Amino acid sequence: MTKNRSFLHAVVSTARPRQWLKNLLVFAGPAAAGGFDSWATVSESLWVFAGFSATASGTYFLNDVVDRENDRRHPTKSSRAIAAGQLSYGVALVIGFLLLLLGIYLASVPRWQSGAVVALYALLTVMYSLVLKRIPLVELAVIAAGFVLRAMAGAAGTETPMSTWFLLSITFGSLFVASGKRFAELLEMGERSVETRSALSSYTLTYLRQLIVFSCTATAIAYFLWAFENAADANSSIPYHELSIIPMV
């Protein structure tokens, strides 16, 4: 019984269910378009959310197998199930690939286009784990693209058109998150950071700080333009879109 619980705990911890919060971005497009007054849109979004969550968890299994040696040298990642030897590589690979297939299937239930976006995310993430994470700037772009693909999958699954400004606000917002994450890693680990992530050797705190400021500013500008663009088409007595920019001012 204890062994089964340990195995289950290792599987769940590797799946990282807390990270599913990122997948709430699949609701961004339909929510911004006011589409949640329809149960059909809600159910379609839930299918995509479930699919993206399963797929993302699958990529974590594959990534942890690839990263196991680096994780063992990291102060916190060394406790991950695969790095700590609590979950075998073979079992992790099987679970990872099964979750990828399940996720793509679930995301395809409302429309094949959303499944295609999730499949693209899976492919990009696997490439990131194998190669792209070692290339400076490219690895930041891939992380940002992952967030953008979440929003695109939700829009595709519900046939919600996404404006250029809204997509740009998500893109730059994602770059802000990615650069902030690398800044925190470099600040915490210092020179030792290259032992766990080789791309960090090409970054400096000053450069990442500038990238954070740029992406944050670009996010705000793109969002303001989206809000005012949609306000002109809303024909509402209450300026919801204009009011939404207040927290960002």
Q: What are these language model-derived features?
A:
Residues 32-35, 109-110, 130-131, 156-157:
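Helix-loop junctions at the membrane-solvent interface of multi-pass transporters
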Residues 68, 73-118, 164-175, 209-221:
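Multi-pass membrane catalytic core of lipid/isoprenoid biosynthesis enzymes
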Residues 52-63, 121-125, 146, 150, ...:
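Alpha-helical transmembrane segments of multi-pass membrane proteins
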Residues 20-23, 49, 57, 96-97, ...:
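Residues within membrane-spanning alpha-helices of integral membrane proteins
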Residues 136-146:
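Cytoplasmic-side transmembrane-helix entry/capping segments in multi-pass membrane proteins
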Residues 1-72, 85-98:
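Topogenic membrane-insertion module of multi-pass membrane proteins
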Residues 92-129, 133, 223-249:
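Transmembrane helix-loop-helix
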Residues 1-12, 19, 130, 148-249:
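C-terminal membrane-associated helical module and adjoining short loops/tails
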